[in-house]
Amino acid sequence: DTEINVPTEMNAGIPVTYVPARNTIFLSIAAAYAEKMSINQIFIGVNQIDYSGYPDCRPDFIDSFKRTINLGTKTGVDGKQLEINTPLINMSKKDIIRYGHNMGIDYSQTVSCYQLDREGNACGHCDACKLRKEGFLLAGLEDPTRYKN
C-alpha cells in the first residue's frame, strides 16, 4: 500500500507494515494441503530475532498454532501429529543470508523492501532494507539489491 507511511526507524510494538493474520493464513493453507497429501511436516521461514515486531513470527505463536492444527484436523486427532518446522527462527539476518548463499539462493531475485518503486528498486531506508543491508555486510557478501539511492 503506497499510502502507508513506512517508518525508517525500528520501533517497539507492532509496525504499520503488519499484515493481519498473515502467517495464520499461510499455515492454515499449508496444514490443509499437508493433511490432504498425507504430509506431516510444514516449513515456514519466520524469524524472531529480526522480526520487526510481528506477533506471528514468535515461537509462542508457532507452538500455539501447532496445538491448534493438531486439535482441529483429522490427522492430529488420529494421532499423526503435524509438525511445524521453523529453521530460521533463531538465526540472525547474517546467518540467514549465509545459509541461503550456501544453498545457492539467487538474492537478486528476492526483495525485503516495503516501498519498492515501479521499477522494483528498494527504498534503502525502511527497517527491512536496513536489516537486509546489515545482514549482507556482516555476512561478507555483496548485496545484489537494486536500491533507489
Regions found by a protein language model. Give the residues of each.
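Nucleotide-activated chemistry modules centered on ATP-dependent adenylation/adenylyltransferase
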Residues: 1-149
